[in-house]
From Swiss-Prot:
It is a single-pass type I membrane protein. Keywords: Cell membrane, Glycoprotein, Membrane, Repeat, Signal, Transmembrane, Transmembrane helix. Belongs to the Giardia variant surface protein family. Glycans are attached at residues 289, 676. One of its GO terms (cellular component) is plasma membrane. Residues 18-679 are extracellular. CDD domains: FU (cd00064). This is Major surface-labeled trophozoite antigen 417. It comes from Giardia intestinalis. SUPFAM superfamilies: Growth factor receptor domain. Residues 1-17 form the signal peptide.
Length: 713
């Protein structure tokens, strides 16, 4: 009952007018307390008066005011009692509806606040003679006798928690701010302006606006407050209201998903992602469909180390509606074209379907089929027109291979590259570097090459003959490709080099290590040359390149060419069709296109590119032939039918159809001989022919008349 009476008196007292400073006894001398938007008295006039609940009352008179402020001096309370607490030299009740309730939610009944209201904190150890609640923004603070610590708030702090009294003096006296005032941001227990979030630490913090819980400067790596663990620099996404990491710390990789960003270990870049190392901009865990380093529409990928170019990965699975290309470097739209390897076609799925674009690394042939190499259909090359890959004919006359622009790169035997054209060699040459008889680089079978002074080309003529004197041969003991070469020189100080005798001193590059040369032969050849039948030969020049592929060191052949054997510098020519042999009559391995029969090799059937077991059992078909999966023995011409597969007349290169049903996949149709390659129509050609006949006839008639008339004259 007394409590209710006391509360009623207090509330009646508070119903007085707002704090004003006056000089009369019982009036407020100093309005020094601000609670919320209101001001209250902190010092009164008159010896018997002191502030209770922010107003001046007579605290000498017995009653509730004296209970709340039992001790006073000089217009201020020096001790509080009951359910009050001291704040800025006044005693305040913590009851609801009173100004003190905004400072303290409960007190201990002996004049000390035990639970501070939001925006304030209760210093540990405060007595009823000391201020026992401090504003979070009070930077002056209060010194508590017990322990001697001065407890302070933080400038512009709106909410906080009390310092840890057990911590050191310096660490334990400042409150921990949990929310700053309006327009301020909490950073490292300091309330700062928004622009100061990144002061001195570029992009290490971000300003996060939060009107409910308070604005904060959040460290990029503070995952407990919305940051990203192991993040080095970041930004704030206003749309998602999330911190977005822009660079992870060393040895971590930035991964971005629909849920946000994270920093992960390298081995976690999987399941639709792959790692990219970048010491400058930061390592990244990129999605397989990354527009720069990934593959469009790729869902599952694998990192390719050391690859140069745009894509750093190969794709093993694509998103719906797409499939990996043959080389796994792109994702291609899934089509319903029945032509194998076809990406786009007209009359899709019908009998008259025509493929217009191939997928992956395959090329569109002249017959609208898809093939992995244009060289398989003859003198064609792979070209790119826009986004399409096409097989185009190498139109340069006598050209063996063209580049992807159609420019001739190598000429057929008997021709040499002359600018963009192929010009004929001299009739005595098999291959040449120019058009004269002394420009031969290889000779026809049975003819020997004699190099000129520069050692790069020479003349083709009859094989080795014996004689005496300088440059003559004593023994013609080497035969290569039907032509004989010298194996022992007539002059003992000379030796055969590439089959020709000359002294060591006359060589532009000495190829024999013997010093001096003795007996007209070389005992040890230099590196990059190999010894053969008394002479030294090169693997890059004829005739040496015919018999040896590699001779890097030691002056001996390390790898003989197919069809030859070199044993201690002595050449053995294997039998026909033999790739490797123990002797000239004992073959151990046959060349492609031959099959082993006892110790010899038998040529495969004409329909076979390779055969196995018997000459007519094709392992791979020759150009112009095909073989069905169920077919045995020889291959079938592209023009003929076999085991349910239909051939196509005039087809020069083909493959069996899928599932071995229907027509062959024809890659090239032969020229019938009536093709008009000039581009003129048949009518135009006929008109020109008639005109030529008329002109020629008229000219002959005129000449006859002229001579007859002159004869009469």
């Amino acid at each position: 009952m007394f409590g209710r009476f006391l509360l009623a008196i207090v509330i009646l007292q508070l119903a007085r007018t707002a704090c004003t400073q006056e000089a009369d006894d019982g009036k407020c001398k100093t309005c020094g307390v601000t609670i919320g938007q209101d001001t209250w008295c902190s010092e009164c006039n008159g010896a018997n008066y002191a502030p209770v609940n922010g107003q001046c009352v007579d605290v000498n008179a017995e009653g509730p005011s004296k209970t709340l402020c039992p001790q006073h001096s000089a217009g201020k309370c020096t001790q509080c009692g009951g359910n009050s607490f001291m704040y800025k030299d006044g005693c305040y009740s913590s009851g609801e509806g009173l100004p003190g309730h905004s400072l303290c939610l409960s007190s201990d009944g002996d004049g000390v606040c035990t639970e501070a209201a939001p925006g304030y904190f209760a210093p540990v150890g405060a007595a009823n003679t000391e201020q026992s609640v401090i504003a979070c923004g009070d930077t002056t603070g209060v010194t508590i006798a017990a322990g001697g610590n001065t407890y302070k708030g933080i400038a512009d702090c709106a909410e906080c928690s009390a310092p840890d009294a057990t911590a050191g003096a310096e660490a334990g006296k400042v409150a921990t701010c949990t929310k700053c005032g309006v327009s301020k941001y909490l950073k490292d227990n300091v309330c700062v302006d928004k622009a100061q979030c990144n002061s001195g630490s570029t992009n290490k913090f971000v300003a996060v606006d939060d009107s409910e819980n308070g604005n904060k400067c959040v460290s990029c790596s503070d995952n407990l407050n919305g940051g990203v663990a192991n993040c080095d620099t970041c930004s704030y996404d206003e749309q998602s209201k999330k911190i977005k990491c822009t660079k992870c710390t060393d040895n971590n990789y930035l991964k971005t998903t629909s849920e946000g960003t994270s920093c992960v270990q390298k081995d976690q870049c999987k399941d639709g992602f792959f790692p990219k190392d970048d010491s400058s901009a930061g390592n990244k865990c990129l999605p397989c469909n990354d527009s720069t380093d990934g593959i469009a529409n790729c869902a599952t990928c694998a990192l390719v180390s050391g690859r140069s170019g745009a894509a750093l990965v190969t794709c093993s699975a694509c998103t719906d509606g797409y499939k990996p290309s043959a080389d796994k470097t792109t994702c291609e739209a899934v089509s319903n074209c029945k032509t194998p390897g076809c990406k786009a076609c007209s009359n899709e799925g019908k009998e008259n379907e025509v493929c217009t674009d191939c997928d992956g690394s395959t090329y569109l042939t002249p017959t609208s089929q898809c093939i992995d190499s244009c060289a398989k259909i003859g003198n064609y090359y792979g070209a790119t027109e826009g986004a399409k890959k096409l097989c185009k004919e190498c139109t340069a006359a006598n050209c063996k291979t063209c580049d992807d622009q159609g420019q001739c790169q190598a000429c057929n035997d008997g021709f040499y590259k002359n600018g963009d054209a192929c010009s004929p060699c001299h009739e005595s040459c098999k291959t040449c570097s120019a058009g004269t008889a002394s420009d031969c680089t290889e000779c026809p079978t049975g003819k020997a090459l004699r190099y000129g002074d520069d050692g790069t080309k020479g003349t083709c003529g009859e094989g080795c003959t014996t004689g005496t004197g300088a440059g003559a041969c004593k023994t013609c003991g080497l035969t290569i490709d039907g032509a004989s070469y010298c194996s022992e020189c007539a002059t003992t100080t000379e030796y055969p080099q590439n089959g020709v005798c000359a002294p060591k001193a006359s060589r532009a590059t000495p190829t024999c290590n013997d010093s001096p040369i003795q007996n007209g032969v070389c005992g040890t050849c230099a590196d990059n040359y190999f010894k053969m039948n008394g002479g030294c030969y090169e693997t890059v020049k004829y005739p040496g390149k015919t018999v040896c592929i590699s001779a890097p060191n030691g002056g001996t052949c390390q790898k003989a060419a197919d069809g030859y054997k070199l044993d201690s510098g002595t050449l053995t020519v294997c039998s026909e069709g033999c790739k490797e042999c123990a002797s000239s009559t004992d073959c151990t391995t046959c060349l492609d296109g031959y099959v082993k029969s006892a110790s010899a090799c038998t040529k495969c059937d004409a329909s076979c590119e390779t055969c196995n077991g018997a000459a007519t059992t094709c392992k791979a078909c020759a150009t112009g032939y095909y073989k069905t999966a169920s077919g045995e023995g020889a291959c079938t011409s592209c023009e003929s039918d076999s085991n349910g597969v239909t051939g196509i007349k005039g087809c020069l290169n083909c493959a069996p159809p899928p599932n071995n049903k229907g027509s062959v996949l024809c890659y090239l149709i032969k020229d019938s001989g009536s093709t008009n390659k000039s581009g003129l129509s048949t009518g135009a050609i006929a008109g020109i022919s008639v005109a030529v006949i008329v002109v020629v006839g008229g000219l002959i008639g005129f000449l006859c008349w002229w001579f007859l008339c002159r004869g009469k004259a």
